[in-house]
Regions:
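Alpha-helical segment of the N-proximal tetratricopeptide repeat
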Residues: 8-39, 56-59, 87
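Structural motif corresponding to the intra-repeat A-B loop/turn of tetratricopeptide repeats
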Residues: 23, 57, 92, 125-126, ...
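TPR alpha-solenoid repeat register
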Residues: 46, 81, 115, 148, ...
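Canonical tetratricopeptide repeat
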Residues: 49-52, 83-84, 118, 151, ...
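Eukaryotic alpha-helical solenoid repeat scaffolds
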Residues: 144-321
Length: 321
């Protein structure tokens, strides 16, 4: 068989296997990928897919046997291969091996958000407080990867650090906008704003806050005359509008921040009320939100189209924690 014909065969096998995997038929996917792997035993992509297919059938040792030769050879693996291997080690009940692997992988791939996320989740499962440091490092090194924001926002929610829960939670729902995790964090965001403004003077205790945090609190502290009306989508729209105008005037040049730029962009497009309804409406009152979208259908549709045209990415160098 010519190399070209063999490549065609391998590509077709992979395509068929992916179709089976998409339908949850991992047994057939494994059967096909095994044949593809026999044809190209050095093909990392096939190895990753075969290992994952074994893993999804609860055959973790077979999954490890496939992927381990690649991670043992530093030049053969990518960050995804390390992620797969780390997940398998955890399933096999070998956390020390997993931790050793994650540390090595992060050294080799320091900008891989997925590695930090998985390592942090493993530490969290072991009740290790270092987990948040790992997620924070992931946010710093790979700022457009969503899951580190998700885990950090939930961590800060339970630790009652509402400032960072608010910021990281909203960044996350703009990176990952239409999943169950999105809905979960929308609920957390609304509750965090209520808890955040439960303190009448946000600058009362800032001894351990950095300059960026104090700037944020200073701008938010000026919105107390709106807060006394209660926290709901309408008052949050007003609070956040005034915040952005104040931030733009006083701090935007010193602290460029993608989330605030996005909010300003929506303000200028006249879509900020719809955006705030999208975040807070259903969490506050589903019936009221449905009523709002019914009465503002063109605005709601325009926001959806506008957001669909945006891939929310956070630039490097905007890390202030």
């Amino acid at each position: 068989m010519s190399l070209f014909a063999q490549q065609e065969d391998v590509d077709k096998l992979q395509e068929n296997a992916r179709t089976f995997m998409q339908h949850g038929d991992y047994a057939n996917a494994t059967l096909i990928l095994t044949r593809a792997f026999q044809l190209e035993p050095q093909n990392l992509q096939i190895a990753k897919e075969l290992s994952l297919s074994y893993f999804l059938q609860n055959e973790s040792q077979k999954a490890m046997d496939v992927i381990k030769p690649f991670i043992d050879n530093t030049n053969s693996a990518d960050d995804q291969a390390y992620q797969i291997a780390g997940t398998i080690y955890r399933k096999l009940g070998q956390p020390k091996d997993a931790e050793k692997l994650y540390k090595k992988a992060i050294k080799d791939f320091p900008n891989s958000g997925g590695l930090y996320n998985d390592y942090g989740e493993m530490l969290l499962a072991a009740h290790d407080p270092e987990s948040i440091k790992i997620w924070e490092k992931g946010i710093q090194m790979d700022p457009s990867f969503g899951s580190n924001y998700y885990n950090a926002a939930k961590y800060y929610y339970y630790k009652k650090d509402n400032l960072w829960c608010i910021l990281y939670g909203e960044i996350f729902i703009n990176i990952e906008s239409f999943t169950a995790r999105t809905a979960e964090l929308k609920d957390i965001l609304l509750d965090s704003y209520k808890r955040f403004f439960a303190t009448p003077d946000l600058l009362q205790n800032v001894k351990n806050r950095n300059d960026f945090e104090i700037a944020f609190l200073t701008c938010m502290n000026k919105q107390n005359d709106v807060v006394i009306r209660g926290i709901n989508p309408e008052t949050l729209t007003m609070i956040r509008t005034r915040f952005i105008l104040e931030w733009d005037k006083s701090y935007a040049a010193k602290y460029p921040f993608r989330l605030f730029n996005w909010q300003e962009q929506l303000l200028q497009a006249g879509l900020f009320p719809a955006y705030n309804q999208w975040i807070f409406g259903a969490s506050q009152n589903l019936a009221a939100y449905q009523n709002w979208t019914g009465n503002h259908s063109s605005e709601a549709d325009e926001f959806k189209q506008f957001k669909a045209g945006i891939i929310f990415k956070v630039p490097q160098g905007q890390y202030y924690h």
